[in-house]
Amino acid sequence: MAVCGRVRRMFRLSAALQLLLLVAAGVQNSHGQGQGLGVNFGPFAGQAGGGNPVGQQPPQLPQLSQQQQQQQPPPQQQQPFPAGGLPARRGGAGPGGTGGGWKLAEEESCREDVTRVCPKHTWSNNLAVLECLQDVREPENEISSDCNHLLWNYKLNLTTDPKFESVAREVCKSTISEIKECAEEPVGKGYMVSCLVDHRGNITEYQCHQYITKMTAIIFSDYRLICGFMDDCKNDINLLKCGSIRLGEKDAHSQGEVVSCLEKGLVKEAEEKEPKIQVSELCKKAILRVAELSSDDFHLDRHLYFACRDDRERFCENTQAGEGRVYKCLFNHKFEESMSEKCREALTTRQKLIAQDYKVSYSLAKSCKSDLKKYRCNVENLPRSREARLSYLLMCLESAVHRGRQVSSECQGEMLDYRRMLMEDFSLSPEIILSCRGEIEHHCSGLHRKGRTLHCLMKVVRGEKGSLGMNCQQALQTLIQETDPGADYRIDRALNEACESVIQTACKHIRSGDPMILSCLMEHLYTEKMVEDCEHRLLELQYFISRDWKLDPVLYRKCQGDASRLCHTHGWNETSELMPPGAVFSCLYRHAYRTEEQGRRLSRECRAEVQRILHQRAMDVKLDPALQDKCLIDLGKWCSEKTETGQELECLQDHLDDLAVECRDIVGNLTELESEDIQIEALLMRACEPIIHNFCHDVADNQIDSGDLMECLIQNKHQKDMNEKCAIGVTHFQLVQMKDFRFSYKFKMACKEDVLKLCPNIKKKVDVVICLSTTVRNDTLQEAKEHRVSLKCRKQLRVEELEMTEDIRLEPDLYEACKSDIKNYCSTVQYGNAQIIECLKENKKQLSTRCHQRVFKLQETEMMDPELDYTLMRVCKQMIKRFCPEADSKTMLQCLKQNKNSELMDPKCKQMITKRQITQNTDYRLNPVLRKACKADIPKFCHGILTKAKDDSELEGQVISCLKLRYADQRLSSDCEDQIRIITQESALDYRLDPQLQLHCSDEIANLCAEEAAAQEQTGQVEECLKVNLLKIRTELCKKEVLNMLKESKADIFVDPVLHTACALDIKHHCAAITPGRGRQMSCLMEALEDKRVRLQPECKKRLNDRIEMWSYAAKVAPADGFSDLAMQVMTSPSKNYILSVISGSICILFLIGLMCGRITKRVTRELKDR
């Protein structure tokens, strides 16, 4: 740019401005367009100053006073006034121009145009006429070329006379004294006014400011009047084809188009990687300086003024010009449907210039001037990149705000406006244009308004519409940091409009613009209050916020100290290769869950914020950068069909063993974290809110969870208030926990040392539980002095064992073995509440061998430790509290059996106890008490049965039947006899407790005793029915079982419930002193029956006689147990003579054969025998 005076400036106005001031001797009130500053000028050009006549060379704008005085007018037209100045005023016309001075309106070449275009009341004021003429653009009101030429020469002649400067010194006296730079300008050179224009923003004196503003408007009407502009941009104008600089080829208004064309060339260059045409550095500075000096009044941007004049009237009619207010108003309405396209384009160009130089925004430069200086965000600190200025300054000031520094409210307001502006229109960010052009054309064409393009690109980044290049993604991330919408959701217009209804309902308690609005929206994600459009926009923005911890202002404010101390982070707008933004949050959450022993923990406030972010990230895997990055392939491979909320993470957890190593580690770490703080699972917490409120509020209120909340949810999983979503979520987490014992936080913390010592290299939780529980059981059975498993681990191990019994899926080995059986026999049964396990038990005889074996093992474990029998514990929970509050877990079932027939016993519990008794009686191994009591008797009397037995299949009551027969013979040990008596008594009351009877007499029971078997309460009626119908039984095995029953009843009256009931009073009267057992009371009753002196109850007498007959019959048909029984049967048989004859004859025949056939062995000599 040419030197205008003794100091070279980035931009100077021509001397015309300074000399124009000379005619002003005061300020008067005028009318119409001249109102406000009533200075009446002599003959000079107006704002619309146009081209020169054809053939005239463009005037060389003066650089020195001598050049100004030597400037000659065009030769084609007579110069209306001398170069030295204006004609003498007629009639002493005052400065207002209302006297008899020279009138522009009276000149012949302009009279017709003034009369046609300008209101009559303005004719006497030259300034008003100039404003009127230069603001004309309609073709029908076009100014004649002669008038344009007059105006141009008028302005040009003014630039040649330096004597008018004194007037400006009078009008701006106090201002000049305040601005030292202007006061030091030499007098009479014309530089002082140019200096005042440079400092127009600092002028507070009203008259001076108005005067300088009006003069600036006049000069800005023609780029050729700007000092040095044409020298600096001449080549660029030709290169960019912005219009000829030859005289006469452009009309008055096209001179603003030249500047506009240069501006477009400047912004286009910034948007191309390899621009074909580059604007020279001098011209760039000139263009930006012109834009800066026109930043306060939109009249000074001639192209924008004419393009937006109608829109200004439509949208900003009541907005007063000055201080950039009209610009801002038009910016706010840029995307209105009724905004003209030419105005929108001009506004966009203006905004792009602001993006390159913040001073092009008057309001931003003025409001933030002191803050920029205070926080050293001045130009000297800027990077050299051409597009970084506005973004750098915004980030510099935002950094100060985030550090808690005080930035003026006016400046913050301006920052908010321009951040919103950048978010609304992607084209204002050169980096987006450069890096995302292909993606925009391919995915987001036609979405150019209200921030929709940026959100479209965000959607692509999230993987919902294709893929995005890394450069584009990085450009988007940078733009999000520059605009910082996390600090105020209103910056993102697309989000603001989409979520307005949600904010008004769900977040109305939070102040508008508060950063917590975004958190509130995240908390209501996937709820009834959330609308779909808001959900999409919110997740699109959160995708980027989650990748840079600084973009969450609340997190940054609460954690910047911890991040600096623990993660070695830098300032808000600084980055580090060693600790990239995405890695900082990972660092924070690793420290958030450290124990006090591990040290270096986060502050309480920061920890709460980290937990908040973790809760939000659990909503969507795409909000967890590390998870999405490492698991992208696995998500596509295993979870492509899992599109519902929260399903993707669950899917990854379900396929944990199949995932790639890096993805498995990430998912494993996240799951381990969830086990410590299940509130991270925000969707699960939302589903379980009623249960938490009613049953777990104490542990939920704890700031440190440590797995207590999940444990509480598991314990209350089957409460009536439990909803399906919560139950499914809790069960799923339990299933995930089975994959690795680390996923059970309390178990891990209680048993990690024991696992390392006793179960090394075991990973799966179920295997760890089996390993530890086996160790505990062995130590207990061997009565070891000291348990190898620590006490705290044993306690938590018990909790884990009990939890695993609730669902067959929590016991993977059993579940895998029985999958096909579940499908075949339990397809209609729901998982949970141990219902599938119970179903398998009921269908045990039909199960596959492998499943049957697993179920038998499970039952054996449950009988040894009834507390592990989930169904029994659930059904009999209240009865256990009533009858067995002090009972040990091992003796729980025994206690319940003893109280089974109590009147206070719950029928459902009684039914369940009976079920377990039936199970126990199928195999002695399922009855630990019997097994221990008969340890010596079983191998002694039932050895043959044991040799045929298999380890994992039932003996169907054979051993117990064997022991019952020995009980009748009174050959058992006392402990074993006591247990068999109890079993015999119970099975006498309920035939279902006798497996052998059920097995062999099922048809007879169905045919002969169907009514008795259908009775709800079994009191021995089926057994009595079989005894009565003994002669009708054809099946030998069934008959044998009934005979055995008769034999057992003879051993003890308690074993015959019908007889015992009938003879209860008689026993009390006649046999009270007799000790029960070994048939003693039965013998007493028999003696009483034979004694004529004793009168028994009729029912007792009848039953006794029936029993005697049955026993007599049984004795006849019962098979011999030994040789003595066999001899007795032969001697009492009616055919005994025949049997004895056959036996004797057989012996005689054998003797005769021996006599006749001789010896069988070979004869040898005596010598050989004696040897």
UniProtKB/Swiss-Prot annotation:
Widely expressed; found in kidney, pancreatic islets, parathyroid, thyroid, adrenal tissue, brain neurons, astrocytes, adenohypophysis, cultured pheochromocytoma cells. Residues 33-1137 are extracellular. The gene is Glg1. Residues 1159-1171 are cytoplasmic. Binds fibroblast growth factor and E-selectin (cell-adhesion lectin on endothelial cells mediating the binding of neutrophils). This is Golgi apparatus protein 1. Residues 1-32 form the signal peptide. Fucosylation is essential for binding to E-selectin. N-glycosylated. Contains sialic acid residues. The modification Phosphoserine is found at S953. It comes from Rattus norvegicus.
